[in-house]
């Protein structure tokens, strides 16, 4: 695929994968592993692909090279889905040099038993790789989302090679009916979201560049309305809500708490609120995390289980904390048969999160819904709708 006259796409699509990084469901739309070629007087290849697709990738590269020989392999990120082809590339093209950060070369020793000492070129912030007619200026992007990561900027065609930044779930040969944001959001908050301050740092560097195209390592090449993508990443990485709305995440066993959640959702919608509801035992938890970060309010609803909260709720709260959940209003709904304690437990688990505001009101369901707990639902719906 031609991105510009001299920059080509040679990535691959994976339709066999079911779980990305062993946990994120991509069974419906697959995954893309992106790689690029910059054709100057010298030729640079940007990143490789996952181990199962190295032969296909090398075939794509040969087609674009059209008899020429690459001079450089630029490694922006060492995660195996982007670095598995390094050794095969270096063997096939013995005159090529490998360009990466010092941190990436240290990782190469761990993965390949060598850092290709006779052929390596270590780059850092501000270094320039001159290809003749094109050049790559390197931008340090540590912890977006691994410590060795670098971005690069090609100044002739004004292209940012952004490693895992601006990536999304889904293969590139399938059109996503939901557009970019939904699966990009799930990808960001699942994989990159913990490292918001590092994303903020690299966005500040990118603000000084004239960027016309963004080439990430997953998902589509971004060529239009780039301000939208940059602004969205700024919102996500600063942990600000993207939209007004309420996510309800619940864990119910016999249906009594589920009934309370359904009544609360209906009461909120009747008050004009946008509501998304997740059964944590059955729904995709990554989507629940995504919406918890997307909206400005969150309801946590759990049964009391062995004096604690239900395991999937504990996992959900832990995942939010692990990804630096903050700047939100949170309400609690609990249930129990004789001594409800879930709200107390959830309150304690939320204590370590930054700028979390608990609502004044909560809902307690003792056994099943009754007039008292229904009244609490109405009061909480009023507070959440202010």
Protein language model regions, located:
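Metal-dependent phosphodiesterase/nuclease catalytic metal-binding core
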Residues: 37, 151-215, 223-250
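Conserved beta-strand hairpin/beta-sheet module of binuclear metal-dependent hydrolase folds
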Residues: 2-62, 151-154, 158-162, 257
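Short, charged N-terminal beta->alpha structural module
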Residues: 249-271
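Structural motif
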Residues: 42-44, 72, 134, 158-161, ...
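Active-site neighborhood of phospho(di)ester-bond hydrolases with catalytic His/Asp-centered motifs
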Residues: 46-48, 70-78, 98-101, 160-164, ...
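FMN-binding flavodoxin-like domain, especially the glycine-rich phosphate-binding loop
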Residues: 172-214, 218-221, 263-278, 288-386
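Active-site metal-binding motif and surrounding structural segment of the metallo-beta-lactamase
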Residues: 41, 52-99
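Metallo-beta-lactamase
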Residues: 2-5, 100-149, 195-201
């Amino acid at each position: 695929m031609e991105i510009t006259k001299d920059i080509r796409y040679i990535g691959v699509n994976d339709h066999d994968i079911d779980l990305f990084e062993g946990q994120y469901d991509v069974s419906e739309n697959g995954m893309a592993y992106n790689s690029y070629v910059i054709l100057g007087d010298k030729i640079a290849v940007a990143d490789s692909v996952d181990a199962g697709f190295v032969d296909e990738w090398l075939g794509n590269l040969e087609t674009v090279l059209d008899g020429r020989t690459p001079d450089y392999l630029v490694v922006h990120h060492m995660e195996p889905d982007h670095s598995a082809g390094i050794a095969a590339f270096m063997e096939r093209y013995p005159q090529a040099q490998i360009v990466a950060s010092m941190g990436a070369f240290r990782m190469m020793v761990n993965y390949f038993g060598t850092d290709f000492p006779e052929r390596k070129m270590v780059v850092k912030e501000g270094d320039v790789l001159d290809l003749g007619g094109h050049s790559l200026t390197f931008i340090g992007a540590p912890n977006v989302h691994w410590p060795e990561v670098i971005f690069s900027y090609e100044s002739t065609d004004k292209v940012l090679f952004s490693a895992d930044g601006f990536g999304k779930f889904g293969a590139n040969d399938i059109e996503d009916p939901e557009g970019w944001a939904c699966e990009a959001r799930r990808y960001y908050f699942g994989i990159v979201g913990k490292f918001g301050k590092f994303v903020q740092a690299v966005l500040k560097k990118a603000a000084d560049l004239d960027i016309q195209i963004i080439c990430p390592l997953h998902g589509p090449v971004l060529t239009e309305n780039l301000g939208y993508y940059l602004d969205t990443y700024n919102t996500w990485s600063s942990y600000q809500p993207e939209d007004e709305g309420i996510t309800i995440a619940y864990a119910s066993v016999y249906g009594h708490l589920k009934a309370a959640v359904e009544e609360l959702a209906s009461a909120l919608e009747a008050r004009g609120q946008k509501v998304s509801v997740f059964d944590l035992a059955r729904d995709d938890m990554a989507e629940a995390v995504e919406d918890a970060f997307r909206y400005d309010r969150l309801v946590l609803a759990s049964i009391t289980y062995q004096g604690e909260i239900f395991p999937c709720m504990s996992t959900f709260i832990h995942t939010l904390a692990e990804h630096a959940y903050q700047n939100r209003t949170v309400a609690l709904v609990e249930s129990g048969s004789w001594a409800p304690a879930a709200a107390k437990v959830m309150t304690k688990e939320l204590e370590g999160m930054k700028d979390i505001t608990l609502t004044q009101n909560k809902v307690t369901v003792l056994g099943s819904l009754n007039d008292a707990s229904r009244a609490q639902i109405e009061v909480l719906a009023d507070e959440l709708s202010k």
